[in-house]
Amino acid sequence: SSVLRGSGLSSSAAFEVLIAAILDGLYNGFVVDAKTRAVIAQKVENVYFGKPCGLMDQMASSVGGMVTIDFKEQDAKVEAIACDFAAKGYALCVVNTGGDHGDLTDDYAAIRKEMEAVAAHFGKHVLREVELETVESHVGELRRACGDRAVLRALHYYDENARVLEQAAAIRG
């Protein structure tokens, strides 16, 4: 992988998926599918490296290219988005800003914990199982039960999901 370490561009996920692919090739003849490689890589990140991440980075790294991922079902729906930026007169540039995300494990753990707390308030495991309108209509009690930051993160989650759908539609269209 040529992804810069600690850059916030899923360098650990890219590395884990690379190792999974190498081992799959050496011992299995490349029979393990991209989703399974991603799940294996996530397990490595969670257990071996002690980083409480979700599956998004590993799935995107394993499938490759530009993708949308819907984690609503247990078996994540992954869809490639074909886009030739150059043909449309654009270039996708990655810039090394010198930032380092290497020591943010506790911060990432807090995000997941707080979002799960909001979901648990409604008897669910993840926010994907809770409608935005439900969260919006219970903001007061959520603030008291989970805190302001958890509520803001939950609202940001819904905004991000809507933005991704809009961007995917724009790229396809």
Report the location of each language-model feature.
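Gly/Ser-rich oxyanion-binding loop with an adjacent helix/lid
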Residues: 1-85
